[in-house]
Amino acid sequence: MPHSPTRDIQITKTGLLSKLNFVVKDMCKIKNHRTSCGNPDFYEKCQPADDFAPFLKKILEAGATLKGITICDEFFYSLIGENGHYGTPTNLNAPGCVPGGSSSGSAAALTTNLYDFSIGSDTGGSVRVPASFCGLFGIRPTHNRINTEGVYPMAPSFDTLGWFAKHIDILKKIGSVLLNSNEKTEFSFKEFV
């Protein structure tokens, strides 16, 4: 992304997610950075954020390192994964094929093997479709299960955050951080279907 952070963002080196690095969809507030939501005109008008979106702060406080911001479909409005302004992210698991969207860059980034996990959003398939197209694990939790404050909406009554990983143990760790508001219960998968 032309406006990705110029250096890694890390709050702490300890925690459940320490030594894991990630990228995030161009959809949320990142302290001292602007967001484009896949549109350069929106980026030019957007003011730098005063703080991190709460979900992002939780991930950073758990020790993960933010490596960059990923391309998404313009204003999150597609399941294809193309962006006419910034280009279509390359799905290295299926070269020549679209990565699926709208969290296209978040999924495609993991096919490079440079990142441990990525964050996206899902309104009507924007995590599930790219996970399928790119051969990844992806999860869309129940609506309102994760605080979406600081996340630019597409359809607030349907929007939720989601994440991708190549390994199920990492997917589970992210769930333990994002889905446990009181830290008393551990997130777990009941069964795989």
Show the residue positions of the predicted features.
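Gly/Ser-rich catalytic/binding loops embedded in alpha/beta enzyme cores
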Residues: 1-116
